[in-house]
């Protein structure tokens, strides 16, 4: 089967790789000059299945109001007056109940755990290198309330059989020795030893090279204008003056998927803006050894070989990718507070990206009402964590195979009752 994958971020490239491995003839199209040059470029570097949690959680609406008046708040909202933004936020609020949180987190952990297994198998088969580490994730708490609040997440972890360790302040240094110097600031931590880290851009670039060896064709610097219909199927994708034809099409365009699919399949994927800095390590003893998640600031601090990546924030501001200096200050404050002297933040690079977020936090992977159109988008802050599993699952679905995990609640069909749009795009073949 000839398949066109639209998008060459980590989700698009993993989709292409697993489809090619399943025997399909795959072409990847992207407007950028190479793979992983947008959202996958400088993310937090975490592969954290156990921390796969929706932003829509009990208590978040009240916290959001408080965060509006805090300088270093993890969430910021700027209303733009669009119906889509307001509808998306309303849908997110509806998912902030305890029952919805449990359902959403459960399926996110299911996909993320499977994805880590797929990544480990891929690494064993190919030997792919991406400055990866397998030291686990450590979530640190600064208040007793945060420490006690971990109970609801632990319940989900137990149900999913995810190993965990609840640590006292004195025990934190067992996982991250440099935290011994600041243990007096912390009330404890939750460690997930099965989590991993790695440079997502490096992984995506090298996997694209492996995919090329399997016959995948990459077309960069190519405009992706519209899908062309022929009857009730997709005939091709309009790229400038050219119509690229195939048997099936995969939309993996991240935050741009919603607009691209407008008039065909209406999906609630909104751009959630995040930031990161990447600093060189200057003192090995004061640097992290794996990845640390600061519960107060919702910031991840991740160790690469000779760099520290610090990423976080969530801004509901549309497609604005401007770099706000106040956000850099928060990232620097967090890493310098927990790992003082570990990295030189004065020499750090500063980046922002748009994570494709659904209201329930779960990505949209699988079939659509259009027979030969498939989606792999909406992974939010967990595109790196869920990429391999999503790619393998999609390849199985498109190949007519039974996926290794429950997948019916991951497709767009869970939203069709409330967000289904028209059946035809603007362009027809």
From Swiss-Prot:
InterPro entries registered for this protein in UniProt: DadA, FAD-dep_OxRdtase, FAD/NAD-bd_sf
Protein EC: 1.4.99.-
A cellular component annotation (GO) from this entry: plasma membrane
GO molecular function terms noted in the UniProt entry: D-amino-acid dehydrogenase activity
Positions bound to FAD: 3-17
Entry annotated with the keyword Flavoprotein: yes
Keywords, alphabetical: FAD, Flavoprotein, Oxidoreductase
Catalyzed reactions per annotation: a D-alpha-amino acid + A + H2O = a 2-oxocarboxylate + AH2 + NH4(+)
UniProt GO BP: D-alanine catabolic process
Disulfides per UniProt: none
Metabolic or biological pathway, per its Swiss-Prot or TrEMBL entry: Amino-acid degradation; D-alanine degradation; NH(3) and pyruvate from D-alanine: step 1/1
Domain of life: Bacteria
Keyword Metal-binding attributed: no
Co-factor requirement: FAD
Protein's job: Oxidative deamination of D-amino acids.
NCBIfam families reported for this sequence: PRK00711.1
Family statement: Belongs to the DadA oxidoreductase family.
Record-given protein name: D-amino acid dehydrogenase
Lineage: Bacteria, Pseudomonadati, Pseudomonadota, Betaproteobacteria, Burkholderiales
